[in-house]
């Protein structure tokens, strides 16, 4: 009751402070749409590809690490579910932080998250060509089709990778500009296809348990690797917990997509359950994917190949190799590729909503709050395309290996979620909500740890193995923070000269 009264007070009066009295966005996002949006955000399919398994250590158990990462994500899911049901507004956690904690902090952190996300989307788009090359190369070798192998080798070159990435993202942006609902439909189609391909791949691996080791050994050799023998313990708590941050940073905590579009979600049931359903489905997919690899190959063989052939031997390559028909090979290969573009499709929507929310609060130019009759924030999408194109150009300029350092900016993502936890703590103290307080304390504590790990573990790119901060990553992270602060201060003083106080805006919940 207290929060309803609190929100009622905030919503009274000064609606003129915002760009307009209604967002103009349309409530057209179904339960299925928002669940698929969240699953794309959590990227279960890529957790089964090469984002995690190459970092396995002797004694690591990915099943236990996945379970722990899932359990530790539950408090964060509670915090997000609490706020999405109480304050269902475009921009999600940005709105919560800026209203419950501090407007300036909320705006600055949202800007840093969006810039970090742009770099991540550009890297995902650029390196999607590696997934395509791997699929074409493997299917080509399985069927003696050297044309496919040659095409794959061409696509992996910098300029073709840039063209492919930019063209794919431009198509996704174009669909979203044409009609907002089409953007969500694209998410749902890619999501359902990706999930179906993953389930089929699980079935194929289970159907080949009897000769899995022999067949995948042949695959490793054919793909240029050397089959490794395992020497190490069958289990180590230290090695298992070492894998926890990889799952925590690349998969489970990314649950802000649904909340970011919460003003467009139809029905209270979808608002209340979308985060939990997405989290549970992601957990099941990741656990099943790792589980069938252990089941079919055994712990020793699978761990040895993850350590020594991690970019050849994984869930997807094994499933393609074991498929007994080209149709299945292509289905699974396209499923992997779909996961890559699934991320880009969700990113196009989520980025636009954060920028829209910032513009609605007058932090960014009002043009970014313009919505077409079809419900599309057109200019935020155009900004997204241009900015992603810029980062793609940076990747080509730096070289793909140097550009990998941009992944180190994930420290900004973990820092952002830490601030969400702090906002939850502050609000729970004011409203005397014990359950929210406990969940927020656990969330803040967890992301304090993850922020430290992302800044100190060389595997995450911010810190190098010699103990020196990567200069590319440091420049990007510091530059992002400085730029975000500068944008907020410029907006604050610009609006103040025009008689609008941003502090007053942040005392109100924005209209739907």
Predicted features, each with a name:
Residues 21-27, 92, 178-189, 253-289, ...:
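Hydrophobic, small-residue-rich membrane helices and short re-entrant helix-turn-helix hairpins
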Residues 162-219, 274-281, 410-419, 431-445, ...:
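Membrane-interface loop-to-helix entry segments
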Residues 95-98, 102, 276-345, 364-410:
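TM-loop-TM module centered on a large, flexible mid-protein loop between adjacent transmembrane helices
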Residues 3, 62, 66, 144-152, ...:
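Helix-loop-helix junctions that connect adjacent transmembrane segments
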Residues 52-66, 149-157, 181-190, 331-336, ...:
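Transmembrane helix-loop boundary segments of multi-pass membrane transporters
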Residues 54, 75-82, 86, 90-169, ...:
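Hydrophobic transmembrane alpha-helices that form the core helical bundles
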Residues 1-60, 73-78, 222-225, 229, ...:
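Membrane-interface "cap" regions at the ends of multi-pass membrane proteins
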Residues 51-52, 64, 201-203, 207-208, ...:
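A generic transmembrane alpha-helix motif of multi-pass inner-membrane proteins
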């Amino acid at each position: 009751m207290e929060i309803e009264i609190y929100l009622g007070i905030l919503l009274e009066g000064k609606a003129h402070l915002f760009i307009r009295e209604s967002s103009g966005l349309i409530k057209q996002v179904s339960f299925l749409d928002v669940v698929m949006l969240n699953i794309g955000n959590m990227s279960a399919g890529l957790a089964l590809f090469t984002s995690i398994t190459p970092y396995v250590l002797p004694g690591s158990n990915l099943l236990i690490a996945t379970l722990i990462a899932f359990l530790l994500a539950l408090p964060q899911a509670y915090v997000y579910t609490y706020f999405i049901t109480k304050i269902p507004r475009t921009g999600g956690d940005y709105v919560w932080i800026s209203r419950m904690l501090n407007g300036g902090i909320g705006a600055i952190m949202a800007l840093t998250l969006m810039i970090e996300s742009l770099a991540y989307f550009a890297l995902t788009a650029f390196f999607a060509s590696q997934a395509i090359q791997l699929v074409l190369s493997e299917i080509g070798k399985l069927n003696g089709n050297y044309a496919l192998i040659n095409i794959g080798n061409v696509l992996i070159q910098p300029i073709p990778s840039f063209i492919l990435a930019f063209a794919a993202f431009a198509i996704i942006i174009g669909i979203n500009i044409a009609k907002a609902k089409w953007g969500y439909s694209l998410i749902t189609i890619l999501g359902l296809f990706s999930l179906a391909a993953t389930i089929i791949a699980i079935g194929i691996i289970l159907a080949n348990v009897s000769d899995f080791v022999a067949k995948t050994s042949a695959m490793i050799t054919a793909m240029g690797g050397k089959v490794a023998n395992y020497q190490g313990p069958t289990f180590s708590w230290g090695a298992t917990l070492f894998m926890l941050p990889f799952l925590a940073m690349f998969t489970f905590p990314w649950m802000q997509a649904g909340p970011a579009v919460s003003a467009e979600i139809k029905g209270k049931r979808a608002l209340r359950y979308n985060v939990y359903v997405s989290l549970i489905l992601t957990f099941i997919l990741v656990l099943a994917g790792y589980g069938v690899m252990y089941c079919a190959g055994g712990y020793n063989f699978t761990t040895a190949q993850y350590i020594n052939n991690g970019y050849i031997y994984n869930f997807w390559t094994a499933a393609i190799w074991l498929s007994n028909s080209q149709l299945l090979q292509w289905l699974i290969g396209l499923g992997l590729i779909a996961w890559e573009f699934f991320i880009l499709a969700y990113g196009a929507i989520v980025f636009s909503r954060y920028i829209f929310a910032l513009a609605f609060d007058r932090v960014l130019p009002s043009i970014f709050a313009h919505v077409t009759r079809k419900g599309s924030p057109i200019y935020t999408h155009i900004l997204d395309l241009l900015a992603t194109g810029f980062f793609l150009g940076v990747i080509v300029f730096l070289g793909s290996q140097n550009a990998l350092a941009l992944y180190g900016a994930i420290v900004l993502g973990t820092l952002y979620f830490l601030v969400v936890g702090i906002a939850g703590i502050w609000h729970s103290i004011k409203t005397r909500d014990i359950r929210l307080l406990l969940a927020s304390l656990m969330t803040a504590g967890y992301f304090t740890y993850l922020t430290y790990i992302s800044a100190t573990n060389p595997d995450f790119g911010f810190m190098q193995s010699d103990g020196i901060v990567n200069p590319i990553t440091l420049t990007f992270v510091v530059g992002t923070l400085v730029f975000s602060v500068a944008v907020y201060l410029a907006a604050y003083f610009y609006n103040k000269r025009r008689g609008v106080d941003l502090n007053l805006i942040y005392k109100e919940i924005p209209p739907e």
